[in-house]
């Protein structure tokens, strides 16, 4: 599903990031983290999986805000405030991205997100928002079903 999404959206990358716990702070509270678990990249585009493993979620607050907005509207990286997430995207040559939450089987909890990234202004300029939004939502349903089947 990721490769089909990436190709149909003419993106550089399509990814699944999943939220999890890992470790504890000094006061005993669990550290919320995320890891990139699945990635499809256009030929010649570098994978980012290694740099997105076991990442502390609070370092990516702007990403989390975008995910919880629940609408996969493409966003220009340059429109983000100066933050760790923006620097991370820029370091990976991302000029535009789209995020949509992935929910658990009951639909109550956000367990991760589906991401598309464009690394070329020419590709980003050609994106039609009205095409990307339903495409992301459709693929999210397949991915949610697949992840739910893995936990049962």
Name what the model sees in each region.
Residues 1-45, 136-152:
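Intrinsically disordered, low-complexity terminal regulatory regions
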Residues 81-109:
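Helix-to-coil/beta transition segments that act as allosteric "coupling" elements at the rims
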Residues 76, 99, 117:
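Conserved beta-strand segments of the P-loop GTPase G domain that flank and frequently precede/overlap
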Residues 23, 43, 104-107, 121-123:
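Generic "edge-of-domain/loop-turn" microfeature
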Residues 1, 52-57, 81, 122-130:
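General structural signal for secondary-structure boundaries
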Residues 110-152:
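Juxtadomain coupling helices with adjacent low-complexity linkers
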Residues 32-92:
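Regulatory sensory and allosteric helical modules in signal-transduction proteins
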């Amino acid at each position: 599903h990721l490769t089909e999404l990436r190709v149909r959206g003419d993106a550089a990358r399509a990814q699944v990031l999943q939220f999890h716990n890992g470790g504890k702070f000094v006061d005993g509270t669990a550290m919320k983290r995320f890891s990139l678990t699945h990635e499809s990249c256009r030929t010649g585009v570098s994978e980012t999986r290694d740099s997105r493993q076991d990442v502390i979620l609070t370092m990516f607050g702007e990403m989390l805000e975008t995910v919880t907005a629940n609408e996969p509207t493409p966003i220009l990286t340059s429109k983000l405030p100066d933050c760790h997430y923006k620097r991370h995207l820029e370091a990976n040559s991302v000029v535009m991205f789209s995020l949509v939450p992935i929910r658990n089987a009951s639909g109550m909890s956000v367990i991760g997100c589906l991401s598309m990234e464009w690394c070329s202004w020419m590709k980003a300029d050609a994106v039609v928002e009205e095409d990307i939004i339903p495409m992301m939502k459709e693929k999210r349903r397949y991915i949610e079903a697949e992840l739910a089947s893995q936990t049962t």
